[in-house]
């Protein structure tokens, strides 16, 4: 997630620059932005991103924001930064509380870290529980500096101004939940906010910002009522803001979670969006909040229904084969994961998305008409579930 040990940038699907199609060079300290600049369509920019090393903490702070962002326990700032941090930490709490309630005993292990110049994060992982094989829910707040080339790439146009290094802020919550029972689906969600400050030597330069995120699920077996329930909750959240959001973001999700070398999707989708700044900022903050608040009602009832179903070794083997696909996507295609691996990110946070166990069999093909085949067919040919 960050170029130097950032939980935020290495979370699944979470790289603040992901919307600008980062490509990676052999040198782990450099990145290439391939978003074309006006009048120079073939220009590939190379730049490094500077972020401080994290420091372990023994307690959760009230906020990870810098003092200059004007946040105190008695007077909460109205800034988008402050409210987004409040939202992602509340989302982390609500999801972890719901998971622990289902587990009936096992608790999340929590790691807290900060950086001397501001920012930090909370990583929570539950492993080998009663219901979940592995569950991770991470939040991060990151301050860093990008070079002027990155700033111009973010603006999407060339400029006569020659700004110096550009400060940026990024915050997000990211989670992957892998249940034990093969009839209970895996869930992934991620919501993030990115903002630049004006370069110090160009104080009038415009501030850039965008939102990204999504919620998607990956079952090993299709229960149509579960799929319809999950997608209906996503649609309800989207429809509160714009009726075009659900069909647009549902297709975006199907396209993003595509395993090219398999010619299939990772799962049965959900919603996904990135680089979203073409609406009112307050509206998008409310939208991201609504989506994050929809995670528990969309997912937990499905797990409650499926967690105690009887299953065979064949069912478990198929679940592990599908988790093999999950591993392939995350390590080969996921922008946040690959960014963290190539730039020295916090490895435990990067790999928290991977299942505890997975399986690969040579030339495995489910028999046509079986429940396993139906799942594979739906991953190859995305459907409209509602």
Curated annotation (Swiss-Prot):
Record key words, sorted: Chlorophyll biosynthesis, Chloroplast, Heme biosynthesis, Oxidoreductase, Plastid, Porphyrin biosynthesis, Transit peptide
Tissues with expression: Expressed in cotyledons, leaves and roots.
Gene ablation phenotype (knockout): Spontaneous formation of necrotic leaf lesions.
Annotated organelle transit peptide span: 1-48
GO cellular component: apoplast; chloroplast; chloroplast stroma; extracellular region
PROSITE patterns named among the record's database cross-references: COPROGEN_OXIDASE (PS01021)
Reactions performed catalytically: coproporphyrinogen III + O2 + 2 H(+) = protoporphyrinogen IX + 2 CO2 + 2 H2O
Record's subcellular location: Plastid, Chloroplast; Plastid
Residues reported to bind substrate: 174, 190-192, 344-349
Region (Important for dimerization): 125-134, 326-361
Molecular functions per Gene Ontology: coproporphyrinogen oxidase activity; protein homodimerization activity
Catalytic site: 188 (proton donor)
EC number: 1.3.3.3
Protein origin, superkingdom: Eukaryota
Main subcellular location: plastid
Pathway assigned to this chain's UniProt record: Porphyrin-containing compound metabolism; protoporphyrin-IX biosynthesis; protoporphyrinogen-IX from coproporphyrinogen-III (O2 route): step 1/1; Porphyrin-containing compound metabolism; chlorophyll biosynthesis
Residues carrying the site annotation Important for dimerization: 261
GO biological process per UniProt: chlorophyll biosynthetic process; protoporphyrinogen IX biosynthetic process
Primary role: Key enzyme in heme biosynthesis. Catalyzes the oxidative decarboxylation of propionic acid side chains of rings A and B of coproporphyrinogen III.
Subunit composition and interactions: Homodimer.
Membership in a protein family: Belongs to the aerobic coproporphyrinogen-III oxidase family.
Record-given protein name: Coproporphyrinogen-III oxidase 1, chloroplastic
Organism of provenance: Arabidopsis thaliana (Mouse-ear cress)
Gene that this sequence comes from: CPX1
């Amino acid at each position: 997630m960050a170029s130097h040990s950032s939980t935020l940038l290495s979370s699944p699907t979470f790289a603040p620059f992901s919307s600008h199609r980062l490509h990676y060079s052999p040198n782990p300290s450099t990145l290439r932005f391939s978003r074309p600049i006006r009048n120079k369509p073939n220009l590939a920019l190379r730049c490094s991103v500077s972020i401080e090393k994290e420091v372990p903490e023994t307690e959760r702070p009230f906020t990870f924001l810098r003092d200059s962002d004007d946040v105190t326990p008695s007077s909460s700032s109205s800034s988008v930064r402050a409210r987004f941090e409040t939202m992602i930490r509340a989302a982390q709490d609500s999801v972890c509380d719901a998971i622990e309630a289902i587990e009936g005993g096992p608790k999340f292990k929590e790691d807290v870290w900060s950086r001397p110049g501001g920012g930090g994060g909370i990583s929570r992982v539950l492993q080998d529980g009663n219901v979940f094989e592995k569950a991770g829910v991470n939040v991060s707040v990151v301050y860093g500096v990008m070079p002027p080339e990155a700033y111009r790439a973010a603006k999407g146009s060339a400029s006569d101004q020659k700004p110096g290094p550009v400060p940026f802020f990024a915050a997000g919550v990211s989670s992957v939940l892998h249940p034990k029972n093969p009839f209970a689906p895996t869930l992934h969600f991620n919501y993030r906010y990115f903002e630049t400050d004006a370069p110090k030597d160009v104080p009038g330069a415009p501030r850039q910002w965008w939102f990204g995120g999504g919620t998607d699920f990956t079952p090993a077996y299709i229960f149509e009522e579960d799929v319809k329930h999950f997608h209906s909750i996503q649609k309800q959240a989207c429809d509160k803001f714009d009726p075009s959001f659900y069909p647009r973001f549902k297709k975006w999700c199907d396209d993003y979670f595509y395993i090219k070398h398999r010619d299939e999707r990772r799962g049965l989708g959900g919603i996904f969006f990135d680089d979203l700044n073409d609406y009112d900022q307050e509206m998008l903050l409310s939208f991201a909040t609504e989506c994050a608040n929809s995670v528990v009602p969309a997912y937990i009832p499905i797990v409650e229904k499926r967690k105690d179903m009887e299953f065979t070794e064949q069912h478990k083997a198929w679940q592990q084969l599908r988790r093999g696909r999950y591993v392939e996507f995350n390590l080969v295609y996921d922008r946040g994961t690959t960014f963290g691996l190539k730039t020295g990110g916090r490895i435990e946070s990067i790999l928290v998305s991977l299942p505890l166990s997975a399986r690969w069999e040579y030339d495995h093909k489910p028999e046509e008409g079986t429940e396993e085949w139906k799942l594979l067919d739906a991953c190859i040919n995305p459907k409209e579930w509602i």
